[in-house]
């Protein structure tokens, strides 16, 4: 269910400060964050944000199609390695 339009988009203040600081300094290093719940704003376009997935920080390069989505959508938390193979089928 989307957030109410009356409330507006959410972004953590500490992440917003990091983004503004990176934009004014022109720094291209990835910004490390644990804030998966923050919405991607238009001023983040062109930055690389390292989003924590529970184990490591996944680098996410922000493009214009990502605006309005959450950072956590681009850093998957679960790895699927496939189901166990059938041992009977391998013997044949």
UniProtKB/Swiss-Prot annotation:
<comment type="function">
    <text>Protein S19 forms a complex with S13 that binds strongly to the 16S ribosomal RNA.</text>
</comment>
<comment type="similarity">
    <text>Belongs to the universal ribosomal protein uS19 family.</text>
</comment>
<keyword id="KW-0694">RNA-binding</keyword>
<dbReference type="InterPro" id="IPR023575">
    <property type="entry name" value="Ribosomal_uS19_SF"/>
</dbReference>
<keyword id="KW-0687">Ribonucleoprotein</keyword>
<dbReference type="GO" id="GO:0005737">
    <property type="term" value="C:cytoplasm"/>
</dbReference>
<keyword id="KW-0689">Ribosomal protein</keyword>
<dbReference type="GO" id="GO:0003735">
    <property type="term" value="F:structural constituent of ribosome"/>
</dbReference>
<dbReference type="GO" id="GO:0000028">
    <property type="term" value="P:ribosomal small subunit assembly"/>
</dbReference>
<dbReference type="InterPro" id="IPR005732">
    <property type="entry name" value="Ribosomal_uS19_bac-type"/>
</dbReference>
<dbReference type="GO" id="GO:0006412">
    <property type="term" value="P:translation"/>
</dbReference>
<dbReference type="Pfam" id="PF00203">
    <property type="entry name" value="Ribosomal_S19"/>
</dbReference>
<dbReference type="GO" id="GO:0019843">
    <property type="term" value="F:rRNA binding"/>
</dbReference>
<dbReference type="InterPro" id="IPR020934">
    <property type="entry name" value="Ribosomal_uS19_CS"/>
</dbReference>
<protein>
    <recommendedName>
        <fullName>Small ribosomal subunit protein uS19</fullName>
    </recommendedName>
</protein>
<dbReference type="GO" id="GO:0015935">
    <property type="term" value="C:small ribosomal subunit"/>
</dbReference>
<keyword id="KW-0699">rRNA-binding</keyword>
<dbReference type="InterPro" id="IPR002222">
    <property type="entry name" value="Ribosomal_uS19"/>
</dbReference>
